[in-house]
Amino acid sequence: MNQWTVGNARFTAITDGVIRMEYTKDAVFADGATLFANRSCPAAGAAFTQEGDIVTIATKKLTLTYRVGAPFAPESLSAKIHTGKVETTWKYGDKNENNLGGTLATLDGVDGHRPLPDGLLSRDGWHVIDDSGTPVFVDGWLQCRSQEHLCDLYLFAYGHDYPAALQDLAFVSGKMALPRKYALGSWYSRWWRYSAEQFLQLVDEYDANDFPLDILVMDMDWHYQDWGYEEGDPRALYGYGHAGGNLGWTGYTWNRREIPDPAGLLAQLHRRGIAVTLNDHPADGIRDHEETYPAFTKMLREKHYQEEVPLIPDKQSERERENSKRDVVNFRFNAGSRDYMEAFFESTHTQYEKMGVDFWWLDWQQDYLYPMVNGLGTLTHLPWLNYLYYAHSRKNGLRGMSFSRWGGFGDHKHPIYFSGDTVSTWDTLAFQVYMTVSAGNAGCFWWSHDIGGFEDPSPEKQSELYVRWVQFGITSAALRLHVCGNEKIDRRPWTWGEPYCSAMREMFHLRSMLIPYLYSIAYESYRDSVPMLRPLYFFDSENKEAYDHPTTYYLGGSMLAAPVCQPGEGETFLALSKVYLPAGTWYDYFTGIRYKGGKVITIQNDLYSFPLFVRAGKPLPMQPYTNRMTSTPLSHLIVRIFGGEETLSDSFTLFEDDGITEGYMSGAYRATELIYKYDGKNRTFSYTPTGDGYPGECTSRTLTLELWDIEEACCADAPKGTAFTYDANRRCGKLEIPGFSPTDAFSVTLTNL
């Protein structure tokens, strides 16, 4: 390892662009991993020299200078950064003036624009992440580091090579994890008291109204709580509560008045291809009214656990005071105790997962009660709980699946995230798009938003706004409808009347059809540490225009989206958008109109479309519409290519696996390179699969190849059984190749007549 100790300072060259800088009072340093740093990254090639009291560490991207014996200060610690076109100097304590922004932890209560905290990417060409004072892992659990360890900084130097910065983040902190495939699908959520019959009816309605559904979210009314309490219900008599003293805000006992047979309900939903998540507010822990309390306390007794969390007298509920003399032992929620959290998960969460719960919606809101984790210094709950819940979900070969607010740098390893309770306004939608695109700058690739907004201040339905919000959801990481417990607001699309229902249906169908592409770029995000939603400047950092369009973004490398964030005009809600198209040739996905890039274009969209473009020549893998978009086997692959008359060559890698395990990490996947070439005469499409395959892979596949913007009909040199048709109105040629094995390689040649 390229690591050097000089007095009370230690420096570690991790990559060519990252140096760790530590300073202590006693020359004792921290080697354990933290929530941010994983310590398993390779060491970079670096040269160390010392002349007198000045040491220099040089890598390919930076030269760091430190005066031995001095505390870190602008006069004692600096670095010259030399990467590509960027030559600059960093000094300890410098402010990152031109940071491109990161992401907020939550959008709770947000109505319009909010300032963003710093992300990793900056036009200054560097950024410093401060990991000082954070606990370190010892034998699999966090412990406070020595107070003598004063400073723990990571200097990232990348110039304007933004992809390299995120790749370095993955080296230092860990890769951006791939979520379970169903996270990319259609979610339904509403803060509402549903019965088992109503949950099943929801699925029936989705199918009957021709909308896809993959995940059903059961908000907090799946368990007993104060609101709606009836005599004889289990009721909390202990705890702090939330929202005006509702002690049932935390709950772990199924409301059997509404859901008498939870296991039976979950089994029925699973048979219909629906995954289920339960809302979880853990702040009051598992108390004596819960059905899992006996198992929980038994485990704690076996561990000889003792209460460690001090009481907060001014937050104690009146109900608890009245019942404080009961001969019952209750333990405060204690995320800092390994014994407590092991019993917490095993007694309750594991049992409900055996019943059929797929993952948990960690809805932590209680920093006002517990600003710090008990016994872990200044560590706040959210990043630690995100780590614990994600680690808990990685059982029996399953890949982790979290669903929580964003916990800051390092939390990119625990997807997916929900942004919280926004207000339904056009300004909020615009800000949400901007923040989601900027979030990738911090490694946060997987935002799931309350589509339509959580709270709607308007006295009338904002139908146009809802449709446009859905269109943004189509081109983001997750399509999750959600709303507050207001009987006047219902996010079921078919309840909104026409033309809104039909417009949303078309968008939901588009999402379903795009899943092969979306899941492939999700894997690309994991593999290459690039965001799924990429700002225009990400690969075009020297182009000033790329910084001026914060709500336009690449969706992977093949598509570009610019969601409509303002009301349209007239009966068709025609919205005018100015969109910057990067260099190259682009096609409007909805109309097939061709545009030359490198400039701003003006485009109009009615309610049934929005600015969505496909790069010319890029094979776009799709599937026929299916109402279970993330679990239906890909037995029919559609590859759409907007090719036109330009000579070009391009490719895309289709990624497939079982969607739920970590088998892909050890080769259990199929990666198929889809290649398109046009030399001015012949068009060639190649299908080249690689990889070991995976359990459940389909054995027979039909391929439909769609070539758009072709002037005349074509004949085909293709595998036996191939059928060719030409649609003159759409200028689209179609080839259908039936019944081949997904493991077979082949090519198709088309020659203009």
Where are these regions (language model features)?
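Short, well-ordered beta-strand segments enriched in hydrophobic/aromatic residues
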Residues: F11, I19-M21, I57-L64, L560-P563, ...
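A low-complexity, Ser/Thr/Gly/Pro-enriched, surface-exposed linker/loop concept
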Residues: T12-D53
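Solvent-exposed beta-strand/loop surfaces of large extracellular or lumenal domains
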Residues: D31-A46, G245, D588-L607, C715-P738
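Catalytic and substrate-binding clefts that recognize carbohydrates or anionic sugar/phosphate headgroups
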Residues: F48-A183, S189-W191, A196, V203-A208, ...
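Aromatic-lined carbohydrate-binding/catalytic grooves of carbohydrate-active enzymes
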Residues: A177-M372
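Gly/Pro-rich turn-and-neighbor structural signature
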Residues: S189, Y194-A208, P212, L216, ...
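Catalytic core of carbohydrate-active enzymes
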Residues: R399-G400, F409-Y417, F431, A439-H449, ...
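Surface-exposed interaction regions enriched in Ser/Thr/Asp/Glu
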Residues: F740-L753
